[in-house]
Structure formats: structure tokens, C-alpha cells
């Protein structure tokens, strides 16, 4: 069952059980590429976007990884590629758009100054 569900005119996030998440998480890695569809863009510029990645756990792109210019945000229904940005105990996959047009405008500069595991994995997998 898909985690993003449209109920009474709004999207709800109802992920699979923690056991399912633990099994799935063991097969995922930072900077891994996934295909997905933007299905929830509630308030451009405020929160981020919900993404259906065809798994029992949903994806989410945080507002801090998206362009400041909200006209560059993907629209609901946009199919695109993502990189896994973060995975932890909470059953949700944090994502980074693979297409630079859908990332924050200063992404290249910003990523070089980040010290976390997601940034390190991205730099390792995407260094020239």
C-alpha cells in the first residue's frame, strides 16, 4: 500500500510499519537514485514536497533543498529522479532532486560547505 493517501481533499502520510521500514532501509543508501512523482506541494516556499517513490514508505524534499524561486519547484504530478538525502529511524526517505533546476540556487557552493553524511555521500558519488 502506498503511504501518501488522498482523503477528504487532503494528503495524509500513512507509512508502512516500523518492521517494513527497517527491512527496506537496510537496502537503501545515501545518494542512491530513485524515480518518483511529486504528489504533494502544499505551500511552495514553506515546507517542501511529498514524493511517491513507489515504495511503502514515502519521500520528502525539504524546503531547504528546493529553489528559493518557488516557480522552479516541481508541480504535483511531475515525474522525476531523486537522490536519497537522508534515512533514519523515522519511516520516510528524505530526497534531493537529481535535476539541478529543482535544487536550491546555491547548491554547489552550499554542498561544499556541508559536513554531514548526506553531503559527503553526494560529493563522493558526484565528484568530477
Protein language model annotation of sequence segments:
Residues 1-128:
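Single-stranded RNA-binding regions, centering on S1/OB-family and related RNA-binding modules
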Amino acid at each position: 500500500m502506498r503511504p501518501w493517501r488522498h482523503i477528504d481533499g487532503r494528503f495524509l502520510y500513512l507509512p508502512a510499519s516500523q518492521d517494513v521500514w527497517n527491512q527496506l532501509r537496510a537496502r537503501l543508501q545515501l545518494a542512491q537514485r530513485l524515480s518518483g512523482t511529486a504528489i504533494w506541494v502544499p505551500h511552495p516556499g514553506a515546507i517542501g514536497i511529498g514524493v511517491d517513490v513507489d515504495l511503502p514508505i514515502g519521500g520528502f524534499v525539504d524546503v531547504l533543498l528546493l529553489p528559493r524561486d518557488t516557480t522552479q519547484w516541481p508541480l504535483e504530478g511531475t515525474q522525476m529522479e531523486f537522490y536519497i538525502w537522508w534515512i533514519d529511524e523515522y519511516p520516510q526517505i528524505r530526497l534531493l532532486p537529481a535535476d539541478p533546476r529543482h535544487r536550491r540556487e546555491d547548491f554547489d557552493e552550499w554542498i561544499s560547505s556541508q559536513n554531514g553524511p548526506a553531503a559527503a555521500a553526494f560529493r563522493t558519488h558526484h565528484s568530477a
